[in-house]
UniProtKB/Swiss-Prot annotation:
Enzyme kind, highest EC tier: hydrolase
Peptidase A1 domain ranges (all copies): 162-496
Disulfide bonds, paired cysteine numbers: C190-C193, C196-C271, C217-C235, C222-C230, C307-C500, C419-C461
Source species of the chain: Arabidopsis thaliana
MF annotations from Gene Ontology: aspartic-type endopeptidase activity; aspartic-type peptidase activity; DNA binding
Tissue expr: Expressed in young seedlings, leaves, guard-cells, stems, flowers and siliques, but not in roots or mesophyll cells.
Cited function: Aspartic protease involved in drought avoidance through abscisic acid signaling.
Name the record gives this protein: Protein ASPARTIC PROTEASE IN GUARD CELL 1
Gene: ASPG1
One Pfam entry name: TAXi_C
An example Gene Ontology biological process: response to water deprivation
Length: 500
């Protein structure tokens, strides 16, 4: 009789353990993922807004320019501020519908990414400046074929996505310039033009500025160019972009004015007499990169920050120098530098989470290796975040796993391989996506920063893409609506949500 009682007791214990285990497992399995709400209607309304936007009635052209007669000279601790506009508020859309606009954006985005990857590859492989030195004939005009250079990132096909209005010269002539964290050389189109594309403001005439000075071939700034030549003891420069666009001219210095915030003397900038490419009305480019010729280094800025508004909203924000205001609740990350190339701003990224769960990734997948390859850069000119292939696949698969109940859209659209059909919805709950940075801080993305419309009929795609390179790039779609602060004195990146 004892043996049956033992079996009965064993059965009770086993059943109790089974029920306990099952209960714990069911609680774990029933824990819902974290979600965001995507406003489908609002996003689709903005697709119509940007197509119908009339730049002649926007703040870019209806607001009187600030008086440039009173700004004081800038010192390295002075704050400066500029209004920031998105590219698609700058000129009237030539696209028949939002899908064609999207495809155009993605095409030029691919050109830019290819340029960034190529520039870093040249640096990693140790291409010497002497290998790039052009042969120049004293008797010739500006000939682009005489100035060969590696492909570099920048405003290829007008891919500069954000603009500010800057004054150049004395008296200051205002003009719109592309802002680019992936470029160092500042340049504008100049008279006389061997070949100039159309811009919205008159082309700058250096003879109209009392502070304009051509730089000689022996000037220290000339030796800092990746590609330079000499003619009549004037330093010539060339910058080339991913699609074959370029600017060629002489390197000079002049006064640069930031509205009424202040002005800076003797800024080195290219005066481009031969310029080719669709730069969308901008007069040139203001380089915000980490190299010595960038405006940030020339003005000895201790910090700069920007907040990128939604490209489809038609609104503006600001670019601020020397006004760090990081709060305790803001996400921060290490600002890292690549010893092989100083242009780009690398950020310490450790991974992602989807629906509140960390995505499993190999350690050091986002590190810069000993050769200078890999890592993650923060770039305002790249639109869609690119991830090293293994990281992208893991992130995408985690997102797909939590969206099996959502109606799938087209199998792929350009860069995107994960799309949904939200045409019958006004709002939809989607899993959260967050960046996790080295040091433990994280940034939760709004749903509209990772699910974006690609047409005006309700197709939304997961706004990340893989790259065959080991380099990853955090693009401006994921940055929109977040104040990004580059604290150059402390080597910290700050990310403050909803601070535009």
């Amino acid at each position: 009789m004892a043996f049956p009682r033992f079996l009965s007791l064993l059965a009770v214990v086993t059943l109790s353990l089974f029920l306990t285990t099952t209960d714990a497992s069911s609680r774990s399995l029933s824990t819902p993922p974290k979600t965001n709400v995507l406003d489908v209607v609002s996003s689709l309304q903005q697709t119509q807004t940007i197509l119908s936007l009339d730049p002649t009635r926007s703040s870019l052209t209806t607001t009187k320019p600030e008086s440039l007669s009173d700004p004081v000279f800038f010192n390295s601790s002075s704050p400066l501020s500029l209004e920031l506009h998105s590219r698609d508020t700058f000129v009237a859309s030539q696209h028949k519908d939002y899908k064609s606009l999207t495809l155009s954006r993605l095409e030029r985005d691919s050109s830019r990414v290819a340029g960034i990857v190529a520039k870093i590859r040249f640096a990693v492989e140790g291409v010497d400046r002497s290998d790039l030195k052009p042969v120049y004939n004293e008797d010739t005009r500006y000939q682009t074929e005489d100035l060969t250079t590696p492909v570099v990132s920048g405003a290829s096909q007008g891919s500069g996505e954000y603009f500010s209005r800057i004054g150049v010269g004395t008296p200051a002539k205002e003009m719109y310039l592309v802002l680019d964290t992936g470029s160092d050389v500042n340049w504008i189109q100049c008279e006389p033009c061997a070949d100039c594309y159309q811009q919205s403001d008159p082309v700058f005439n250096p003879t109209s500025s009392s502070t304009y000075k051509s730089l000689t071939c022996s000037a220290p700034q000339c030796s800092l160019l990746e590609t330079s030549a000499c003619r009549s003891n004037k330093c010539l420069y060339q910058v080339s972009y991913g699609d074959g666009s370029f600017t060629v001219g002489e390197l000079a210095t002049d006064t640069v004015t930031f509205g009424n915030s202040g002005k800076i003397n003797n800024v080195a900038l290219g005066c481009g007499h031969d310029n080719e490419g669709l730069f969308t009305g901008a007069a040139g480019l203001l380089g915000l990169g980490g190299g010595v010729l960038s405006i940030t280094n020339q003005m000895k800025a201790t910090s700069f920050s920007y907040c990128l508004v939604d490209r489809d909203s038609g609104k503006s924000s600001s670019l601020d120098f020397n006004s760090v205001q990081l709060g305790g609740g803001d996400a921060t990350a290490p600002l890292l530098r690549n010893k092989k190339i100083d242009t780009f701003y690398y950020v310490g990224l450790s991974g992602f989470s989807v629906g509140g769960e960390k995505v499993v990734l190999p350690d050091a997948i986002f590190d810069v290796d000993a050769s200078g390859s890999g890592g993650v850069i923060l770039d305002c000119g790249t639109a869609v975040t690119r991830l090293q292939t293994q990281a992208y696949n893991s992130l995408r698969d985690a997102f797909l796993k939590l969206t099996v109940n959502l109606k799938k859209g087209s199998s792929s659209i350009s860069l995107f391989d994960t799309c949904y059909d939200f045409s019958s919805l006004s709002t939809v709950k989607v899993p959260t996506v967050a960046f996790h940075f080295t040091g433990g801080k994280s940034l939760d993305l709004p749903a509209k920063n990772y699910l974006i419309p690609v047409d005006d009929s309700g197709t939304f795609c997961f706004a990340f893409a893989p790259t065959s390179s080991s380099l990853s790039i955090i693009g401006n779609v994921q940055q929109q609506g977040t104040r990004i602060t580059y604290d150059l004195s402390k080597n910290v990146i700050g990310l403050s949500g909803n601070k535009c």
